[in-house]
Amino acid sequence: MEGPGQDTEDALRRSLDPEGYEDTKGSRTSLGTMSNPLVSDVDLEAAGSRQPTAHRDTYEGYVELHELVLDSRKDPCWMEAGRWLHLEESMEPGGAWGSHLPLLTYHSLLELHRAFAKGVVLLDVAANSLAAVAHVLLDQLIYEGQLKPQHRDDVLRALLLRHKHPSEAESVWTLPAAQLQCSDGEQKDADERALLRDQRAVEMRELHGAGQSPSRAQLGPQLHQQLPEDTEATLVLVACAAFLEQPLLALVRLGAPCPDAVLAVPLPVRFVLTVLGPDSPRLSYHEIRRAAATVMADRVFRRDAYLCGGRAELLGGLQGFLEASIVLPPQEVPSEQHLHALIPLQRHAVRRRYQHPDTVRSPGGPTAPKDTGDKGQAPQDDDPLLRTRRPFGGLVRDIRRRYPKYLSDIRDALNPQCLAAVIFIYFAALSPAITFGGLLGEKTRGMMGVSELLLSTSVQCLLFSLLSAQPLLVVGFSGPLLVFEEAFFRFCEDHGLEYIVGRVWIGFWLILLVLLVVACEGTVLVRYLSRYTQEIFSFLISLIFIYETFAKLVTIFEAHPLQQSYDTDVSTEPSVPKPNTALLSLVLMAGTFFLALFLRQFKNSVFLPGKVRRLIGDFGVPISIFVMALADFFIKDTYTQKLKVPRGLEVTNGTARGWFIHPMGSATPFPIWMMFASPVPALLVFILIFLETQITTLIVSKPERKLVKGSGFHLDLLLIVAMGGLAALFGMPWLSATTVRTITHANALTVVGKSAVPGERAHIVEVKEQRLSGLLVAVLIGVSILMEPILKYIPLAVLFGIFLYMGVTSLFGIQLFDRILLLLMPPKYHPKEPYVTRVKTWRITSSPLTQILVVALLWGVKVSPASLRCPFVLVLTVPLRRLLLPRIFSEIELKCLDTDDAVVTFEEAEGQDVYNEVQMPS
């Protein structure tokens, strides 16, 4: 997503450069070597020659803020008021810790900048305790004239008070703030005493040792385990001092981290930031302390603080923080939607702030840092879609890349998470196999059905798990293949050909085609399959799913029409049509669809714990089938058409075929001309398998998933197509990689790091890249062939409800469908997406208009006698996208309208759906 232009950035910089900053010019830098040598009552090490602290640019920077308060016994102490770790975290009045985005006032940032400009900056102080730091700090404040010598002991005793951490009984919300008073009896005037009447004066007593509250004992170790070993902390101390005339700030950077145990987390302290000042109505120390802690928690400023050699560099880092900040004008915000425009502006500012200083800028935007070494060439050489220009070169590279890791594929499977994934993927693969098997039997009149599809899925999944280069792929039947089977079956019926024998010859040509494509490294053509083509394909399949569901329902109503009156003579035999069948079929189909859709949406709701919701949502389809089949089972007096499943390893239609299909024909000789014409339908099948398999491999191989064993575009395609070609010889369906099931499989095997750090996104620890989960799923699906006593009770209307569910839900992740909906929305309700904000509205409608025209053309071909040619028309969308659309849209518009911006989701939050990542039909 592109950010705002340069004008916006310049305006932001000018607004953050007020005249009040001019007093920073000519200010001195105070170094640790300028400490007063009279400090002799503490253990200080020799400072030596000062060198900049080693660069520790860790992502985590822990900051803890302590305020001076009076505890329940009216004793002064330092109380933890908040902590910063990515986000600001503070204890709410109810006693619970809550994290939120730190929001700062503009005035507090100005005051902080002035304080840094005039305050004390001590760099690389050689002190091994916070007490030593306090002595050095006070001596420097007196040396620079910011603290009177008679106040030294008062401030020192305050800095050495014990530190406590909040609990339900004691926190900054329940305890009064304390104020430093001078011990020599100096008093304020009457107005100041009236102003401070609610604050108790601190009775100066030096308390050694750090207090430890229950919250520290419980939370500290838990949070510490989530942080890297090299994390260092910043301690911010804020107190109100009545004897000071103006605020003072002192920043101390230690030469070596101090291990004093005053923090809630056992971390060494590298920075100590102290803010002291008089209580004044024009100064809000609450906001200043939050601003100071937020700045110290900033990743870039922390790097500058580690590396700075003086005050000027530190102020430069603070200036960079201000330039990247956003200021809201003091006016009422009409609605929260208007605040959404801040998100891209803030992201752009953060991206520029985190940008590597060596990055080369060009008119087209930032480019990668210059690197002529070998490290930059390694990823390119390992690109699985890089041409080797040798016959079968890509296949050889896939084998050399993956097969040496075969033993690790077995070892990595010895994990409980893999067993859980097996159970989950089994049901995820079984439900569509039963659904498509029942529908395939309907479309082909029993030539292939549930038993053939289950056996084909089992055998091919087993072989693929053993031999593939990417065993995370789940092989199965899909909607596009079902559409082709129906079209080819009608073609064979119209021309008097044996459908099951024609598939054998298609299988032979499939094997030759895939060998030719793999030999020529044709799989690299997947680079040209943009979102434009994928969404046309997905939208067409979704429409076919929805249309076929209602077409089947209409057929049921025609076979069993409703009657306006019924014969009450019970002695007569009932007629063949059964009017209740149509109504019950409608109820079963609609009930299955809405129940499955509800369970999918329930997965992203806020009810029940997240694990329970995801479990229910992931098993939504089998739950829906079970519930509606159970309802049909208890309705005894109404007939519904059931799923036809043979017993054991029998074929669906034993009278028409066997397990081996003779290539020359069984009932009649197969025409020779059709043997040589079979390359045409074979090419169509190959296009469908190629599209689904290669796009699925691309999705699962995204860098965000952090797979380390590589993928195999060439080897996996060869295995899937070759196994499908051989399966046709036994009268079984050919299969392809299934997108939704593959993503589900990969997510189930992904170990996502659980972090207690507020604001930190879930990160991948590892992915269990192994072969046994797919192998066990294949075995379980094969055993499911023996489930005939259970499967025979499933009504076909229930399967058509699942068919409708797949068609409707496939539209949710298609941006083409979203753009069609934009035509019905007023512009003010349009989403803040790049293709909406960067492209004019009338041009947004032009892109889906061309896609709709192509879909209409494909639909016309589908319903015509030339329905087999649909994949050919689909392939023509590739040159259409690359040759015609650039003449209609500009380059930036095409990038917005035709980019793969699907976010990889490993753990869904409320309102998110992992299947929106998928742009292919399932």
From Swiss-Prot:
Instruction: Enumerate composition-biased segments (Polar residues).
Output: 27-36
Q: Output the PROSITE patterns linked to this UniProt entry.
A: ANION_EXCHANGER_1, ANION_EXCHANGER_2
Which parts of the sequence lie on the Extracellular side of the lipid bilayer? 441-448, 490-498, 555-581, 635-674
Reaction catalysis annotation:
hydrogencarbonate(in) + chloride(out) = hydrogencarbonate(out) + chloride(in)
- Transmembrane regions listed in the UniProt entry: 417-440, 449-469, 473-489, 499-519, 532-554, 582-602, 614-634, 675-695, 712-730, 731-748, 772-792, 793-811
Tissue pattern of expression reads:
Erythrocytes.
Pfam families of this UniProt entry? Band_3_cyto (PF07565), HCO3_cotransp (PF00955)
Report one GO cellular component. plasma membrane
Give ranges inserted in the membrane but not transmembrane.
850-880
List of glycosylated residues:
653
Biased composition, class Basic and acidic residues, residue ranges: 10-26
The record's listing under PANTHER family reads:
ANION EXCHANGE PROTEIN, BAND 3 ANION TRANSPORT PROTEIN
**Protein's name in the database:** Band 3 anion transport protein
Q: Which organism is it from?
A: Gallus gallus (Chicken)
- Give the gene name: SLC4A1
